[in-house]
Design a protein with these regions (language model features):
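Short, flexible coil/linker segments at or flanking structured domains
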Residues: 6, 30-33, 94, 100-101, ...
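Generic hydrophobic/packing signal
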Residues: 9-11, 256
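Active-site loop/helix belt of alpha/beta enzymes
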Residues: 1-4, 11-143, 215, 273
Length: 280
């Protein structure tokens, strides 16, 4: 069997690859031995930046050093007769901040979702593309003194109207967004264009929200769990959820589980629906 592949070099990420930063000559020799194997066909080379999404002087210097070492590696292999047709190193942050490093191709990640790579790196013109939606499955009145969900972390002080939404941590919605009395980091969804704050703990398949101030909420109403600010009035965004839960926006969008159907839109109209439960 013949295998077509690219070299992966470690210039400072410290994850995988030929470690050109530890012993340059040994790494070059190892790659050239691999390139001589008859069943392996190396047509490209790549590396990954560790801190391209940081603008501090120290981290910018580290990123520059990574790229310089990568170029040195490429030039040496080419000088030794190794044909490298595809050269790539730029992730989302490097792609936007250093267009001179695009080489043969770039590896866009978070910017495909229209999100910034980090809080300190902002690109004008990006528009968030992903919205997580669900529906109301139950509406009820909550009397003063009554509690909801596991742990009884929320108890009504006044009469409230509560909606149960079909989404939970098994869908990738963080349990850390659970609402208790006075929790400032509770999640917020949007129903009928108005904010619906979470009350009680997020369950595996369901989450409860306060809809007291939203008139006429009923079963099967559409719920925006999170999405772009202009499309989800009052609801969390991927960035705000990341801030509330102490993580990054990457984890929020990548964490949506396989059981959530994906609806792909073009000009606002669905062009494909992918449902893993039906596909398998």
């Amino acid at each position: 069997m013949e295998v077509y592949c690219h070299f992966k070099v470690d210039t400072g990420m410290g994850r995988i690859g030929f470690s050109v930063r530890s012993d340059f000559e040994a790494a070059i020799a190892a790659m050239e031995r691999c390139a001589a194997l008859p069943k392996l066909h190396f047509s490209g080379i790549f590396q990954h930046f560790a801190v391209a999404d940081s603008t501090t002087p120290e981290n910018e210097a580290y990123t520059q050093a990574q790229h310089a070492l990568f170029e040195r590696t490429v030039q040496r292999l080419q000088a030794d007769g190794v044909a490298l047709h595809t050269i790539h190193c730029a992730n989302s942050a490097a792609q936007m901040r250093h267009p001179e490093w695009h080489h043969s191709l770039t590896r866009a990640g978070i910017i495909l979702y229209g999100l910034d790579p980090s809080p300190e790196v902002h690109f004008d013109g990006l528009r968030p593309t992903m919205t997580l939606k669900s529906v109301v499955e139950f509406v009820k009145d909550l009397l003063p003194g009554e509690s909801v969900s596991y742990g009884r972390t929320y108890t009504a002080n006044t009469p409230r109207k509560v909606a149960t939404v079909c989404v939970g941590y098994a869908d990738g919605y963080p349990r850390a967004l659970s609402g208790s009395n006075g929790n400032p980091n509770a999640g917020v969804m949007s129903i009928r264009g108005k904010p619906a704050p979470i009350i009680g703990r997020v369950c595996m398949d369901q989450t409860l929200v306060d809809v007291t101030d939203i008139p006429d909420v009923k079963m099967n109403d559409e719920v925006t769990v999170f999405g772009p600010e202009n499309a989800a009035i009052g609801a969390d965004t991927a960035d705000s959820i990341a801030a509330k839960t102490g993580t990054i926006n990457y984890e929020i969008i990548c964490g949506i589980s396989r059981r959530v159907p994906r609806v792909y839109l073009r000009d606002g109209a669905p062009v494909r629906i992918w449902n893993d439960l039906e596909e398998t």
